[in-house]
A protein has these predicted regions:
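A short beta-strand submotif of the Rossmann-like class I SAM-dependent methyltransferase core
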Residues: 116-119
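Class I (Rossmann-like) S-adenosyl-L-methionine-dependent methyltransferase catalytic domain
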Residues: 1-41, 46-47, 52-102, 131, ...
Length: 223
């Protein structure tokens, strides 16, 4: 699977080069809702996984948040940094290249919230996802929020294309990991799920879960 994710990186690099506005210029609806949830708790320090072309990271920065944004595509990181400079947001946005399979380069309890939009749908095994979620939990402050979206097993593309194991299918060269409710519960690892709902996005449309979890006091408990 490591080789497959490495191949996916090359595919995304090419995609970003050919279509710099692939996901549109404005923020995602998930990004807007995440901002509302984080702001309601008077939190400001956000870590975004898989920033892509930066639309949500830049939106968060424009709305008063301090954002560290990670992506495994060098082209994506460069594009986010360039856009932040153009918008005079460099002081609020720090873009870094990072592979989610590696430990996060931050100290424990560094952030108020972690956020990602469809990042966990990449070609990651369940074990790799569990590692990534544990790392997110490690860098969250007490009662911090982990907000993410994933495509569901009810998505029109689930079951299409080439089966790659563990709920993953390759469609048009992209490997997508589809989530059922059981996987969402498993990855929560006892943390409180404070928001959970299904929604649609795009022309297909994609069917997604929106999940917001609160870091509990003790790993593996819900208290």
């Amino acid at each position: 699977m490591k080789k497959r994710l490495d191949e996916q990186r090359e595919h995304w690099e090419k995609t970003f080069a050919e279509n710099p506005d692939l996901f549109g210029a404005g923020p995602s609806e998930a990004g807007r809702l995440a901002a509302d949830l984080i702001r309601a708790e008077n939190r400001t320090e956000v870590l975004e996984f898989g920033g892509g072309q930066g639309r949500d990271a830049l939106f968060l920065a424009r709305n008063g948040f301090r954002v560290r944004v990670l992506d495994y595509s060098e082209r994506a990181v460069e594009a986010i940094a360039a856009m932040a400079r153009r918008l005079r947001l460099s002081g609020a946005v720090d873009a870094l290249r990072h592979d989610l399979r590696d430990p996060l380069p931050f100290a424990d309890e560094s952030f108020d919230a972690c956020y990602s939009h469809m990042l966990f749908c990449m070609a990651l095994t369940t074990a790799e996802l569990e590692f990534a979620f544990a790392e997110a939990r490690r860098v969250l402050r007490p009662n911090g929020l982990h907000i993410y979206t994933v495509r569901t097993t009810e998505d029109p593309h689930c079951g299409a294309g080439i089966f790659r194991g563990e709920g993953m299918y390759e469609v048009d060269g992209f490997v997508v990991h589809f989530f059922g409710r059981e996987k969402v519960a498993r990855l929560a690892a006892g943390d409180e799920i404070v928001r959970f709902f299904e929604f649609e996005e795009g022309d297909l449309p994609r069917r997604l879960f929106f999940v917001a979890m609160r870091k509990s006091g003790i790993p593996g408990t819900s208290g």
